[in-house]
């Protein structure tokens, strides 16, 4: 492990943690950063493990609430329905992810220009939905009906195209379906737990033969950086979107996507 690879691992870990739970596409940012920093050769193991750091971050922040909901579920119909809603929203990603995993990883993930374009388009959509979404009918995350949860799950499948953003797709879907801005972000947090844990396990299984023990140092640096950054973001985001909405992230996507697209078209 050299100083340069450690620094790049730190940068990518921070990037993963800072962007995983805001609607800007952590995968898109990671792939573009890896392309421009020349870190693409680090292998799948690095990407997979640092995302686990982000999963553990949201579990850490929401541990007490998750435990209380699980304990209440046998006697509280609303808690039981909420857990069912999260699991139901998770199912479409399982089906599509298993069926299309090879195409997504070998074709879509290798197209930086597509990622930049999706960042821009997603930013435009996010700005529009943030301003034009219908008045919310579900202002608490536990109020989301099962049918709405399933539809949010189908929105999540759009995020398998890198640059779309898992949190962005689920938040946009939730807003369009009548969920309040804070509740939309919180539902996205809860949905990320089974989705990202499942993606981690599946990717780890698929890439078990290419895990690089020699990269453990970089992986550890990226993992810790992703975990710490994600904890800060999860604790900050709900209060921010309750007051200001999602327009900041829409403009962020458009600016980053435009800069990346211009650089790629110039041959970088």
UniProtKB/Swiss-Prot annotation:
Q: Is the keyword Cell wall biogenesis/degradation assigned to this protein?
A: yes
UniProt-recorded Gene Ontology molecular function terms: undecaprenyl-diphosphatase activity
Q: Which interval of the chain is the signal sequence?
A: none
Gene Ontology CC: one annotated term? plasma membrane
Going by the UniProt record, its keywords in alphabetical order are: Antibiotic resistance, Cell inner membrane, Cell membrane, Cell shape, Cell wall biogenesis/degradation, Hydrolase, Membrane, Peptidoglycan synthesis, Transmembrane, Transmembrane helix
What are the transmembrane regions? 4-24, 50-70, 84-104, 109-129, 144-164, 184-204, 214-234, 245-265
Q: Name one GO biological process term.
A: response to antibiotic
What function does this protein fulfil? Catalyzes the dephosphorylation of undecaprenyl diphosphate (UPP). Confers resistance to bacitracin.
Task: Name it.
Answer: Undecaprenyl-diphosphatase
Native source organism of the sequence? Cereibacter sphaeroides (strain ATCC 17025 / ATH 2.4.3) (Rhodobacter sphaeroides)
